[in-house]
Amino acid sequence: MNGSPTPKRYSSKSSRLYDDYYNIPYQYSNPTPMNRDYNDVGSRINADKLVPEEYKRNTEFINKAVQQNKELNFKLREKQNEIFELKKIAETLRSKLEKYVDITKKLENQNLNLQIKISDLEKKLSDANSTFKEMRFPKVKDPMVDDDPVSENYDQINVPKHRAPDATGNPRTTNKVSNTSDQDSRLKAIERTLSVLTNYVMRSEDGNNDRMSPLPSPLNTISPINNRLNFQEPKRYNPTVKVNPSDDDIMMYESAELKRVEEEIEELKRKILVRKKHDLRKLSLNNQLQELQSMMDGDDNIKLDNVSKHNHATHRHSSQSSRDYSPSSDACLECSNDLYEKNRVKPENNMSETFATPTPNNX
């Protein structure tokens, strides 16, 4: 089928004069050949001579510029990715820094509060020590000096020369006695509290020292009796002996004391439990021993009843060597074995009943 747009009527089969004219390819167009090195005739064309040098230089420059542009774009993308990662890291570090700044501020405030508390406690302790010293060692006043200003003008006082022997004492002395009694009671109370505190602190300090370097036991020394007589219980650590013991030290000491008491209680419970177990075991063993003794006594009576006087002449033995002529035996060996086999059934039954574990009565 003819694919041309020309109708079929214009092409006659008789005359093929213009068929080749219409079928000439590339008549009205000049397409580029497939191989540019050759022209239509077939001769080789030198394309380098036709292209000017400026165009070649421009193309090389443009190609280099395009390649550089691609490389720079690739590097730019890498740098942008690095910048993005660094921004993420910076944000995380900034958040951590803010968090640590808040924590440091809180710790500084706590430290200031603790310092204030410590200073207050030190002041209270110094005041208490000063009052204790004043109460413990009061100033001795000069007996010739009197604090009363009236005594300075003693010439103006009319003192009677002759006093009655039954006159009451000086009211100043009575007041002084009452004041001294009150002071003594206060001093005794303070001394008691201080003694308790000092013992507490000395125990805690000695307890820590004992942990670091344990004392040798007095039983291992050369003279154990003297050491036992002169041996004193090691003092335990007590934080209150310090000048300004902290709350943590006191809490640690109290927890250690509680733990020690609990351990002692557990040890005593364990000893009591072991003692109870031993008592129960002893009771069961005593019961078992009594049953065995009763069984042995009963078996001996049965054997004595069953075994009669034996006469060797009534039995015919295989040989005379089998006879037992010992003074303690009344029968020969063969006859005694027969008697043993006959009487063995009863002891076995009794033994099975005896060796059953008895159940002790609950005390």
Swiss-Prot record:
Xref: Gene3D superfamilies: Geminin coiled-coil domain
Entry keyword set: Coiled coil, Cytoplasm, Cytoskeleton, Nucleus, Phosphoprotein
Subcellular location: Nucleus; Cytoplasm, Cytoskeleton, Microtubule organizing center, Spindle pole body
Region of interest (Disordered), ranges: 160-184, 310-331, 343-363
Bias kind Polar residues: ranges: 170-182, 349-363
Domain of life, per lineage: Eukaryota
Chief site of localization: nucleus
Pfam families xrefs: Spc42p
Residues found modified as Phosphoserine: 213, 217, 284, 329
Disulfide partners: none
Biased composition (Low complexity): 319-329
Segments forming a coiled coil: 62-136, 248-297
Keyword Plastid: no
One GO CC annotation: spindle pole body
Quaternary organization: Component of the SPC110 complex containing at least CMD1, SPC29, SPC42 and SCP110.
Function field: Forms a polymeric layer at the periphery of the spindle pole body (SPB) central plaque which has an essential function during SPB duplication and may facilitate attachment of the SPB to the nuclear membrane.
Family listed: Belongs to the SPC42 family.
Protein's UniProt name: Spindle pole body component SPC42
Organism: Saccharomyces cerevisiae (strain FostersB)
Lineage: Eukaryota, Fungi, Dikarya, Ascomycota, Saccharomycotina
